[in-house]
Amino acid sequence: MVVGVDGTENSEPAIAEAFEAASLHGVDLVAVHAWRDSHLTTAFTSDPNGVALDWDAIATAEHAVLAERLAGWKEKYPDVAVRRVVVKDRPARQLNAESTSAQLVVVGRRGRGGISSMLLGSTSRHLMHTVWCPLLIVHSPVAS
């Protein structure tokens, strides 16, 4: 079982479904958090011109993002062993790679209010065409 964790609250419903499914089927869970350098801010720059990035600090921060999103789930599902994967890569590419040995890939559906809430995000759309196992795209409730 594989779950994509993007670090936002939009991941929570997907994480919940993935833990439930892994527990129900008695399988391990792989929690994947992939990040790309194009999304980084100058918060991690060590150069006043914003050129050099502190890759160790970035990796530490990205591991913390995944740990924060998974907090509490292991206590709720003690029977589910979790392997954490944090990589600098496109989320769809890493999730697709993990899907080759998975029974199910679970991801959230991006979209923030209005018409966009009815659309799939780029990762979900990509995985629909490339994933090697069943794919579950979980709706995130729209905040009012």
PLM regions and their residue ranges:
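Small/aliphatic-rich secondary-structure junction motif
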Residues: 2-52, 74-85, 140-144
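Hydrophobic alpha-helical membrane-association signature
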Residues: 14, 62-66, 123
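Short, structured motif recognition centered on aromatic/hydrophobic residues
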Residues: 17, 21, 29-31, 65, ...
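A short acidic, glycine-rich active-site loop
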Residues: 51-62
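C-terminal, charge/polar-rich interaction regions
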Residues: 72, 81, 85, 97, ...
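Short acidic active-site motifs
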Residues: 90-95, 123
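Glycine-rich, Arg-bearing micro-motifs that act as flexible, cationic patches
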Residues: 104-130, 144
